[in-house]
Amino acid sequence: MMTQMKTSSDEMKVAIIANGKPQSRRVASKLFNAFRDDPDFYLTKKNPDVLISIGGDGMLLSAFHMYEKELARVRFVGIHTGHLGFYTDYLDSEVDQLIETLRKDSGAKISYPLLNVKLTLADGRSFTSIALNEAAIKRNEKTMAADVCLNDVLFESFRGDGLSVSTPTGSTAYNKSLGGAVLHPTIEALQLTEIASLNNRVYRTLGSPLIVPKHEKITVYPTRMGSYTLSVDNKTYINRNVKKVEFSIDQRKISFVASASHTSFWERVRESFIGDMEE
């Protein structure tokens, strides 16, 4: 979804975050030098208007979680110091183009939905996280057994290695490797994908990815005690005595700087997984 923000004569607050690769540091240095003495920009990591992530998709994921409490304000833009990444609009050779884009910026943004994850333990404690890509729950010993509910109504009793829930943009990540569908981000929905489910005469699950619309909730109730791993993007949590994990579309969204260089979703998919097709 693309929206237009109100323009302002104030200087743009810009934060720059880079991974440790030499090329990323060189790009960051070029941006610092360009912005440092420019009256249109103010370099700060506190309450930025625009966050520039330099590296790859992993770096942008880390930057997203660093600023997840400021999503209403900040817009992201990615520079990939290598080949084109899924969340990046600019290559390291296009720094001057990015600077010019920000100089002419009108505040326009493109927004994508996020995943809300709520973990509740048997003692009543609960913890909430958000994900840009996906979350997955697995049992650390033996097979995971869990009841899966949709809007608090039992849908299936699952047996297998685990379950993954992805956002539309995350549908191209771990979800795709599990055989899930690629979902366009304008479709505000979640995708539930099974991880090595057991299907035989005793245990039966749907065995297919499930698309759940925006206002519905997925709840997973583990039916066996033990240690469970809950991964949320690039973060991992290990807990015992998990009562339930709830997945839903978050009220917040991640926003990217909208420009002529913002690659369309299907073009990103083609470039990431298919590449140029020879005639």
From Swiss-Prot:
InterPro entries: ATP-NAD_kinase_N (IPR017438), ATP-NAD_kinase_PpnK-typ_C (IPR017437), NAD/diacylglycerol_kinase_sf (IPR016064), NADK (IPR002504)
Keyword rRNA processing: no
Sites where the protein binds NAD(+): D57, G58, N133, E134, R159, D161, T172, A173, Y174, N175, K176, S177, A196
Source taxon at top rank: Bacteria
Reaction equations catalysed: NAD(+) + ATP = ADP + NADP(+) + H(+)
GO cellular component: cytoplasm
Location in or out of the cell: Cytoplasm
An annotated GO BP: NAD metabolic process
Keyword NAD carried by entry: yes
Record-level Gene Ontology MF annotations: ATP binding; metal ion binding; NAD binding; NAD+ kinase activity
Gene3D superfamilies, A to Z: Probable inorganic polyphosphate/atp-NAD kinase, domain 1, Probable inorganic polyphosphate/atp-NAD kinase, domain 2
EC numbers on record: 2.7.1.23
Main location: cytoplasm
Swiss-Prot/TrEMBL keywords: ATP-binding, Cytoplasm, Kinase, NAD, NADP, Nucleotide-binding, Transferase
Signal peptide limits: none
Pfam family, one: NAD_kinase_C
Cofactor: a divalent metal cation
Active site as annotated: D57 (proton acceptor)
Role, per record: Involved in the regulation of the intracellular balance of NAD and NADP, and is a key enzyme in the biosynthesis of NADP. Catalyzes specifically the phosphorylation on 2'-hydroxyl of the adenosine moiety of NAD to yield NADP.
The family this protein is said to belong to: Belongs to the NAD kinase family.
Protein name: NAD kinase
Organism: Streptococcus thermophilus (strain ATCC BAA-250 / LMG 18311)
Record lineage: Bacteria, Bacillati, Bacillota, Bacilli, Lactobacillales
